[in-house]
Amino acid sequence: MSGWRKIYYKLLNLPLKLLVKSKVIPADPVSELGLDPSRPILYVLPYNSKADLLTLRAQCLAQDLPDPLIPLEIDGVQLPSHVFIENGPRVFRYYVPKQESVKLFHDYLDLHRNNPALDIQMLPVSVMFGRSPGREGHGTPHLRVLNGVQKFFAVLWLGRDSFVRFSTTVSLRRMASEHGTDKTIAHKLARVARMHFSRQRLAAVGPSLPARQDLFKKLLASKAIEKAVADEARSKKISHEKAQQNAITLMEEIAANFSYEAVRLSDRVLSWTWNRLYQGINVHNAERVRQLAQDGHEIVYVPCHRSHMDYLLLSYVLYHQGLVPPHIAAGINLNFWPAGPIFRRLGAFFIRRTFKGNKLYSTVFREYLGELFTRGYSVEYFVEGGRSRTGRLLEPKTGTLSMTIQAMLRGGTRPITLVPIYIGYEHVMEVGTYAKELRGAIKEKENLLQMLRGLRKLRNLGQGYVNFGEPLPLTTYLNTHVPQWRDAIDPIEAQRPSWLTPAVNDLANQIMVRINNAAAANAMNLCSTALLASRQRSLTREQLLEQLDCYLQLMRNAPYAKDTTVPDKTPEELLNHALNMNKFEVEKDTIGDIIILPREQAVLMTYYRNNIQHLLILPSLIASMVMYHRRITRTELLHKISMIYPMLKAELFLHYSKEQLPETLDTLIDELARQQLICDKGSELVLNPARIRPLQLLAAGVRETLQRYAITLSLLSATPSINRGALEKESRIMAQRLSVLHGINAPEFFDKAVFSTLVATLREEGYISDSGDAIQEHTLEVYNMLSALMTPEVKLTIESVSMPAETSNQPEAPETPETPETPETPEPEGKTES
């Protein structure tokens, strides 16, 4: 590089250092994209911009990547280490420099032809200053190719809203070996790079935004809404104009009013907020979503719903991953001043709790959703319908998902892909409110005062987690499961073919399973799981560390799913982090520390335990079986677990099929044996007395679930003809009684939805006949197996209410060996806080 050019770059770099603060996508390109800094890298940029080049250089040096300003010297030939695909517009249009990208690609390919050991990494990089999509009819957006003067003002105004996006590398060795090294291949490389950058720009900014009134006019002109308006006028005996005005009022209520400037401002506010409230936001598997957007997919984000924070957190994360924040389906309860107008500008569109009896509303909403898909906007909705009060996934609400498929049946949309997302927190700001609601308190209506009270309480929220699950392409799903689905395409009438409901139900279940597959274990939910497993909610520091190590080894060596994330920290680091969250108490004595979960915190901590209960449920069940039997064959263990696995699968959205269960259990047994929690004697599994404490704590993780199943099965066995409503009601009443007598502090223990799911599963599995009567010999077999795993006191409580005398005389379980922290008979602790 000449001396004059060095001076020029140094002078240009001075204002850039002051004005530009760019974000890197992905955050760690070396590890996430598999870059090898020791091998030569050719940086490929979309168009000639020295500001872009110097912005890239700053990030390369920060990431320990080669300097793009230093030429590559290979076999005595010196070539630039960066290339611009296009020259871009000039201030003085009469001067157009020669395009050098094709020549440079050809020179590099020639080097590979002459040097078989050479393999240069071609690394595409986009540098973006601002990401406004622009308005329809208002010219081109800010992300267009800019000349020098325009670039100056873009840097001046948008330098703090800039992104450096690294893409997956292309091996020039592979290109040379597979396609040759002539100029045709060089031209093809340049052409493919242009297409890549064009798609990347669209994925980053999205389509142009319509004027709101223009959108309403287009919706009003649709055949479906025209018909609904006519029906409204006829059924309510009002004028056509009045019915049309009703439709416009509904559009005003529903539609978002997306503003890029609002997104930019909120990004500043949220960046400041997250940095003060959270110790970090952990994001996993975002690259798969970036690739979907770049491939032109219409993306529908379907996260689990933990908190009102979810709306803001997911949009913030997507924006920082170089993606367009989605249009978000928000409950109408959030449409209050000032939150409603703010959320609208951030992409929220509002949805009522129910559409029943309002055909005009359902038609307007469905057409609006379809228009979002047609225009290419990404959409987000919570398939659970509301926030989980227990920390578990709720049964999915399928209305919006059904409308998504109906939008496909209008024809003309891009391929729609559902992206399940697990959102997790070490502290959920509403968790105290959830506990009150589960105890029977009436849900407060959202308002400004409630929002301010919530904000006042925000502090020390620990870590946040956003894990993108395995995408579910709708076209692929329908082609596989409903090959004839295209026969139902109709651009006017909303279609409800016979296959729609079963397909939607199956899709909803798959989404929930994939959300759980992407779960994030963390310090808070692991420590809560261990302490709640102890009947006195306390463990010595050594015992707690031992149990954390047991959980971590299980999750690392026998992972639940490939998308599940497990902390890479040691048990000591996790415990220290959890203690800093001020949820637990530490009592010190001359022997050592005792970690205590205070009574008032216990019911709140079940929320975090429930976030990951599905990850440990099968190891807990194996431990429980071995604890009771002391010696059990693998075959017998598989038979017993197979009897209740369908109930666990339905309740916790587990991903293992019945066919996968034997292999899964073998893997878990091998890991438990490796940890010496049990002894593997070949065909038999034997209790290891030396490691009974961690095994007992592990077994406790499934205790309350099995007790709940036993309650329902005991009622079915005692009264086979009991109807479904009565069965669910009686089960809840008995569960409440059990929780009072035995101090069970689990809010979901007598949750209505849990019993409803259980009864539905029993019917599907054949325990309840088509006539509605229980098949007593089947229910008794499972009940006897479950009751054997309980303490005599719990079993007696259940049978004293439900079981007839002749069925309750089963042999009692032998006493479980005691350990200091888990006495055999718990003291009643009063009414449960649930």
UniProtKB/Swiss-Prot annotation:
Cellular compartments annotated: Cell inner membrane
Family: Belongs to the GPAT/DAPAT family.
Molecular function per GO: glycerol-3-phosphate O-acyltransferase activity
Entry membrane topology: Peripheral membrane protein
Record motif HXXXXD motif, residues: 304-309
Pfam families membership: Acyltransferase, GPAT_C
Cross-referenced HAMAP family: Glyc3P_acyltrans
Keyword Acyltransferase annotated: yes
Protein name: Glycerol-3-phosphate acyltransferase
Keywords of the record: Acyltransferase, Cell inner membrane, Cell membrane, Lipid biosynthesis, Lipid metabolism, Membrane, Phospholipid biosynthesis, Phospholipid metabolism, Transferase
GO biological process, alphabetically ordered: CDP-diacylglycerol biosynthetic process; fatty acid metabolic process
Catalytic activity: sn-glycerol 3-phosphate + an acyl-CoA = a 1-acyl-sn-glycero-3-phosphate + CoA
Domains: entry comment: The HXXXXD motif is essential for acyltransferase activity and may constitute the binding site for the phosphate moiety of the glycerol-3-phosphate.
Positions of region (Disordered): 800-834
Main location: membrane
A GO cellular component annotation in the UniProt record: plasma membrane
Pathway the protein takes part in: Phospholipid metabolism; CDP-diacylglycerol biosynthesis; CDP-diacylglycerol from sn-glycerol 3-phosphate: step 1/3
Xref: NCBIfam families: plsB, PRK04974.1
Documented EC number(s): 2.3.1.15
Enzyme class: transferase
Family matches, as InterPro entries: GPAT/DHAPAT, GPAT/DHAPAT_C, GPAT/DHAPAT_LPLAT, GPAT_PlsB, Plipid/glycerol_acylTrfase
